[in-house]
Curated annotation (Swiss-Prot):
Protein name: Large ribosomal subunit protein uL23
Domain of life: Bacteria
Record text on subunit structure and interactions: Part of the 50S ribosomal subunit. Contacts protein L29, and trigger factor when it is bound to the ribosome.
GO molecular function: rRNA binding; structural constituent of ribosome
Keyword Cell cycle carried by entry: no
GO cellular component, one term: ribonucleoprotein complex
PANTHER family documented for this protein: 60S RIBOSOMAL PROTEIN L23A (PTHR11620)
Keywords in alphabetical order: Ribonucleoprotein, Ribosomal protein, RNA-binding, rRNA-binding
Assigned protein family: Belongs to the universal ribosomal protein uL23 family.
A family per Pfam: Ribosomal_L23
Protein purpose: One of the early assembly proteins it binds 23S rRNA. One of the proteins that surrounds the polypeptide exit tunnel on the outside of the ribosome. Forms the main docking site for trigger factor binding to the ribosome.
GO BP, sorted A to Z: translation
NCBIfam families xref list: PRK05738.1-3 (NF004359), PRK05738.2-4 (NF004363)
Length: 95
């Protein structure tokens, strides 16, 4: 596994109070071609935590319209990361 690729996999945190506070689950926007083992290694390496499980889903981009011009938002991939008990990520601080 290439170290550079691990740091490029996580694009942005998808912050929601419901996910983090109630279930200890964190949501990230990831590269569309990222696999579950790659996402797990990337989170463990960047945040120094133990990952229990990873679930992913592909989100289809919405069609948009500005007056008569029609467009489309990009498709993206979302990863739900469940941490082991006792592990926590402070997303606001970055690490």
């Amino acid at each position: 596994m290439n170290e550079e690729r691990l740091f490029k996999i996580l694009l942005a945190p998808h912050i929601s109070e419901k996910g983090a506070l109630t279930t200890g689950q964190y949501v990230f926007e990831v590269m569309p071609d990222a696999t579950k083992p790659e996402i797990k290694r990337a989170v463990e390496k960047q945040f120094n935590v133990t990952v229990k499980s990873v679930r992913t889903c592909n989100v289809k981009g919405k069609t948009t319209r500005f007056r008569q011009v029609r467009g489309r938002r990009k498709n993206w991939k979302k990863a739900y990361v469940m941490l082991a008990p006792g592990s926590e990520i402070d997303i606001a601080a970055g690490e």
